[in-house]
Amino acid sequence: MSSLSKPNRQFLSPTTNNQDTGREQTIACARDMVVLYNECLKNHAVSLGGHALDGCGEFTPKSTTILTDPPSLRCDACGCHRNFHRRSPSDGFSQHRSPPSPLQLQPLAPVPNLLLSLSSGFFGPSDQEVKNKFTVERDVRKTAMIKKHKRTKFTAEQKVKMRGFAERAGWKINGWDEKWVREFCSEVGIERKVLKVWIHNNKYFNNGRSRDTTSSMSLNLKL
């Protein structure tokens, strides 16, 4: 009678347990690495009422970064805090997702834009450069608005003389003796282009008025 063979029992060795523990830790680390911090969204021109970014394409932690120390979480490229960088995915990591596969645990490819920035040593304009740019643009806009809204104020006597001159000249100065026109401008104290603009702006308005009012005024023109 043949003897019964004993069942081949297999016990998990400590090495197997360590491998399982390491795999769980790897999956846990991968779950933490799902959240990425991409381009910097800090507005460097907010104090000037504008919008300007520094061009940083991805958050790069410094060598002195400590995860438990929030103030140290600054980008080595642009110097801004990690919270200014766009978080991806924005809705955070879903707890209902299955653990990442081994293919997902591979390191992510670097962002080309960031590599170009690092190789060239340029990380976008500095705060001072952005401030200077917006200051110049603001001054240019302000100067343009002043020139646009600036109106020449005339005295009552100047208006009377210009109205009389315009009526004599047929509400136009082109075609008349240039010397006569300039002598009148010198007498009234205005420039020729100012007189031309005034005649153009008041031509149709004054043609609709009663000429009795104009004729009753003393023109005192030395023509």
Curated annotation (Swiss-Prot):
What are the entry keywords?
DNA-binding, Homeobox, Metal-binding, Nucleus, Transcription, Transcription regulation, Zinc, Zinc-finger
Cysteine disulfide partners in this protein:
none
Q: For the region Disordered, give the residue spans.
A: 1-24
Where in the cell does this protein reside?
Answer: Nucleus
Would you say which domain of life the source belongs to?
Eukaryota
**Which parts form a coiled-coil structure per UniProt?**
none
Single GO term (MF): protein homodimerization activity
List the ZF-HD dimerization-type ZnF regions, as residue ranges.
Answer: 37-88
Cross-referenced Pfam families: ZF-HD_dimer (PF04770)
Q: Where is this site: Required for DNA-binding?
A: 199
Q: Where is the composition biased (Polar residues)?
A: 1-20
Q: Output the PROSITE patterns linked to this UniProt entry.
A: ZF_HD_DIMER (PS51523)
Which ranges of the sequence are annotated as binding DNA? 147-204
Gene Ontology cellular component terms for the protein in this record: nucleus
User: According to its UniProt entry, what is the function of this protein?
Assistant: Putative transcription factor.
What does the record note on quaternary structure?
A: Homo- and heterodimer with other ZFHD proteins. Interacts with ZHD11.
Domains: entry comment: The homeodomain differs form the typical one by having namely 4 instead of 3 extra amino acids inserted in the loop between helix 1 and helix 2.
- Put simply, this protein is called Zinc-finger homeodomain protein 12
The record lists the organism as: Arabidopsis thaliana
Q: Which gene encodes it?
A: ZHD12
